[in-house]
């Protein structure tokens, strides 16, 4: 099946290559200030909200949590210098000597206050449901925090590394959020750029190395790439897949790409027709993922016909690899069984701001049409797409991201319908058995037993299809050779790479 018109793909590839014909002299810059080309202007940088990965990158410059990740992807101490498990439901975190950007010390009272805000009755925090699972937060002294959970949570230290769980000063001015990260937001031109300066009181000696970061939003991926080539920016995220070969061949630039991000579909399960698992499975079997990899990612990826658990994971189940295989005849059969033999008309939410989202939506539209599902595309800007998704104003939606961590509990964000509504997961779609198994998995400390639990969970998810995997994709940053110390973190942690701005430098 044709995926994108040949002429369009040729134009896209040509546009990607044109900027690399030569490297003109870069404009004058302030020494030590890195200019970063962001893929979109963040809808919000509220610390506990999930508004996309562009916002997450800025949050990782400004805020820090109790734990985080090193450049090797391993969990490491952050505001907490150590942590221990006292009992199955009790964890103790020892805080380091650190300051917030208002000059005040980070204390256990700030940690407790942060969790109280997240769990509040009117909170819209991404981790609200998880933090509401805390029985209590104790503060034996200024540098000791004891978190007592209602149920065992083996992954609690991993939760604390999330860029959605930074610790904020309890003395932050109303409507503001004072963090303890390496950079301070000093100015912004809404929709265009943000300027950050180093926090002189940062708790890591000698860091950050940069004298500042200027963040410029380039919604157009070709303009973002051209800005790197011309020297207007030093580093860009979301390198277009059609430009990766040209960047690799350019001696003035370097590409840092990893596999770990993925594309998938979510559904509005609060109403017909996608409240029926048979219809969702029909969608899963209607899509040729090889076509999708070629069309949207220029071959830099692979099909994903199961839950996004990578082969490198101890929790990977090889026999589920092709669970949602391309089988249009089966898709039609499932639709007929669900009472939709005459076809379905529905909408598909995506965004035109990211080429991969738009291209994915177009290919999915073509494949679904072949089995009788007629799709109308809705392609707003990213901020609108997030808002519409959060409100459930769609039938199906294209999503692309990475898991919250390399632990399978990180999949809860995408398939646990008991969590607060979010654009990253299906709307109004609750599968009680999945919620139960996810809870059992995070409560089990024996790894062999955890593997058995997550195997059953994946089997249920394949049957119920609360999300439909589409493709793994390569996720890249590109930079001038003068940039050092910035790393693309491995696997699912690629969107935590903003942590390494603290060690980045530019010549």
Describe the residue ranges of each PLM region.
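Surface-exposed binding/hinge segments that line
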Residues: 84, 127-170
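Aromatic- and charge-enriched surface segment that lines or borders ligand/interaction sites
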Residues: 81-124, 146, 227, 273
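Structural transition elements
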Residues: 303-337, 354-358
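N-terminal lobe/hinge region of extracytoplasmic solute-binding protein
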Residues: 37-87, 116, 178-179
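Long beta-strand-rich cores associated with HINT superfamily self-processing modules
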Residues: 479-507
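Extracytoplasmic/peripheral linker and loop segments enriched in polar/acidic and small residues
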Residues: 370-385, 412-481, 505-507
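Ligand-site clamp/hinge motif
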Residues: 201-246, 374-376
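Gly/Pro-rich hinge or "lid" segments in bacterial periplasmic/extracellular proteins
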Residues: 74, 153-214, 220-222, 328-329, ...
């Amino acid at each position: 099946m044709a995926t994108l018109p040949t002429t369009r793909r040729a134009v896209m590839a040509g546009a990607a290559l044109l900027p690399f014909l030569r490297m003109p002299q870069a404009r004058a810059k302030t020494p030590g200030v890195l200019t970063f080309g962001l893929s979109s202007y963040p809808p919000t940088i509220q610390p506990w909200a999930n508004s996309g990965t562009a916002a997450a990158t800025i949050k990782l410059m400004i805020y820090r949590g109790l734990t985080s990740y090193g450049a090797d992807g391993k969990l490491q101490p952050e505001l907490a210098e150590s942590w221990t498990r006292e009992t199955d439901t009790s964890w103790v975190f020892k805080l380091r000597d650190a300051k917030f950007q208002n000059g005040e010390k980070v204390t256990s009272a700030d940690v407790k206050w942060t969790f109280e805000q997240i769990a509040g009755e009117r909170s819209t925090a991404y981790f609200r449901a998880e933090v509401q699972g805390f029985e209590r937060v104790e503060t034996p002294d200024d540098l000791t925090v004891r978190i007592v959970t209602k149920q065992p949570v083996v992954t609690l230290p991993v939760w604390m590394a999330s860029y959605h769980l930074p610790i904020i000063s309890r003395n932050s001015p109303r409507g503001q959020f004072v963090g303890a990260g390496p950079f301070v937001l000093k100015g912004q031109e809404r929709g265009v750029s943000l300027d950050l300066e180093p926090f002189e009181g940062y708790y890591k000696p000698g860091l950050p190395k940069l004298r500042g970061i200027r963040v410029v939003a380039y919604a157009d991926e070709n303009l973002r790439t051209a800005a790197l080539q011309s020297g207007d920016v030093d580093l860009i995220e979301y390198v277009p897949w059609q430009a990766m070969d040209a960047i690799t061949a350019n001696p003035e630039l370097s590409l840092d790409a990893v596999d770990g991000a993925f594309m998938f579909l979510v559904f509005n399960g609060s109403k017909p027709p996608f409240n029926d698992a048979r219809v969702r499975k029909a969608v899963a079997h209607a899509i040729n993922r090889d076509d999708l990899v070629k069309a949207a990612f220029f071959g830099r990826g692979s099909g994903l016909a199961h839950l996004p658990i990578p082969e490198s994971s101890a929790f990977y189940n090889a026999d589920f690899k092709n669970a949602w295989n391309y089988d249009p005849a089966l898709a039609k059969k499932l639709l007929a069984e669900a009472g939709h033999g005459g076809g379905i008309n529905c909408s598909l939410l995506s965004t035109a701001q990211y080429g991969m989202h738009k291209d994915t939506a177009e290919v999915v539209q073509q494949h679904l049409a072949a089995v009788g599902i007629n799709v109308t595309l809705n392609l707003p800007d990213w901020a609108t797409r997030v808002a519409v998704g959060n409100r459930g104003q769609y039938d199906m939606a294209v999503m692309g991201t990475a898991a919250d961590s390399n632990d399978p509990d990180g999949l809860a964000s995408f398939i646990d319908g008991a969590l607060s509504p979010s654009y990253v997961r299906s709307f109004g779609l609750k599968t009680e058995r999945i919620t139960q198994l996810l809870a059992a998995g995070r409560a089990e400390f024996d790894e062999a037993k955890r593997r058995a639990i997550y195997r059953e969970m994946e089997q249920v998810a394949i049957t119920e299809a609360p999300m439909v995997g589409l493709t793994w994709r390569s996720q890249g940053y590109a930079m001038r050779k003068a940039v050092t110390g910035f790393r693309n973190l491995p696997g699912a942690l690629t969107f935590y790479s903003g942590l390494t701005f603290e060690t980045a430098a530019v010549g």
